[in-house]
């Protein structure tokens, strides 16, 4: 099979990369009615599989789970989760032939095997659903021409998808129809009904493409969402300890600092995050972020280039074929780092202390968010898509680090995201070491003293922060998410 994106001509590539339309709430007036009375079979009962299924059932849909025979016979975790929640569970052979919509929510590396198994069992004219388009775009999976292929991609972990639904809300969601597989022209109706059934229509839905979702998702998770947080954690911890900070305190400042800082980001973008600093600290954070952007821009561009060309995917799939040798080696090495093995700090760190003593961390967040956004937009991805794959998801990933450090982040994210994270962080850490050596007192671990600032300089910095394109689009998109619950649990 050939990478689907690479089979397109340039005009087609640009058209699919640039497909992004914010959908009006009136477009979801029919809710999930298009799928009511039809059989929806979910393959996979992980975080997305279970929680999307719970939401869809609560929205009145007929949901069941198709699992492998051995998973049922051995009563594995997927079988236990589905049965304990009262769902009908059966084998592929028992459930797939009756399904009107088969939703594949297994891990990326299992998609080819799953699709090749279920496709011959699917009835004529059925639909196949994904929540991530890697299998279609990067693997180039060929789907029977009578099958409609759609995507509904919530921009949150599965647990958040469920919690927001229970609150009567939802999470921002991308939907798409694969242009090669919409024989009856019903793909958009199916995707809209599925999105409504998960509650996504209450938080904002973007009509996108499989290509735009995959390329932007890969870029975001590799760079700012996971790679930058991992590289920043390791670099900042080592710097603090090198300068005499208690390792336990240093670990807590970083582990919970990302979450506290990005909670401000979630509520009011980069502007609010920077406004939490004193004026001297804001000017310093801005200067540091500009330096970081200049240093890291080529690395961000390389990741985007490798994602667009398919180089990243081919390398990762080669590692799949080699029993994940690189992934497992990197995972083991990360677990042995000083940050991951540092003792726990029993004292309390106040919320403002994370800002006052984390100026460098704030600069890293600002630089990483802006670079990821700018690089995606420069590559043809529309601003709304770039926002969701950079700034929007960052607080959610930071929250995983607050639970159990980098270990938890890498457990929760997909293997695809984890592989890309290591590629980025292993390149970024040595790249930034000379920069780290030149830091000034007050950049990390100590507060910058209050002092006089130049009014014109402060005015210009504030203007530059607020006028960045990500702040403009973010203000609009956050307007649809004002009811989402607060994430941070740091203390």
Swiss-Prot record:
Annotated PROSITE patterns: KARI_C, KARI_N
Catalytic activity, EC: 1.1.1.86
Gene3D superfamilies in the cross-refs: N-(1-d-carboxylethyl)-l-norvaline Dehydrogenase, domain 2 (1.10.1040.10), NAD(P)-binding Rossmann-like Domain (3.40.50.720)
Residues that hold Mg(2+) 1 according to the record: 217, 221
InterPro entries: 6-PGluconate_DH-like_C_sf, 6PGD_dom2, KARI, KARI_C, KARI_N, NAD(P)-bd_dom_sf
Protein name, entry field: Ketol-acid reductoisomerase (NADP(+))
GO molecular function: ketol-acid reductoisomerase activity; magnesium ion binding
Residue sites binding Mg(2+) 2 per the record: 217, 389, 393
Domain (KARI N-terminal Rossmann) ranges: 15-208
Domain KARI C-terminal knotted: 209-344, 345-484
Keyword rRNA processing set for record: no
Binding site for NADP(+): 45-48, 68, 76, 78, 108-110, 158
Catalytic activity entry: (2R)-2,3-dihydroxy-3-methylbutanoate + NADP(+) = (2S)-2-acetolactate + NADPH + H(+); (2R,3R)-2,3-dihydroxy-3-methylpentanoate + NADP(+) = (S)-2-ethyl-2-hydroxy-3-oxobutanoate + NADPH + H(+)
Species, as recorded: Shigella boydii serotype 18 (strain CDC 3083-94 / BS512)
GO cellular component terms, semicolon-separated: cytosol
Family: Belongs to the ketol-acid reductoisomerase family.
Residues binding substrate: 414
Gene name, Swiss-Prot/TrEMBL: ilvC
Active site: 132
Keywords: Amino-acid biosynthesis, Branched-chain amino acid biosynthesis, Magnesium, Metal-binding, NADP, Oxidoreductase, Repeat
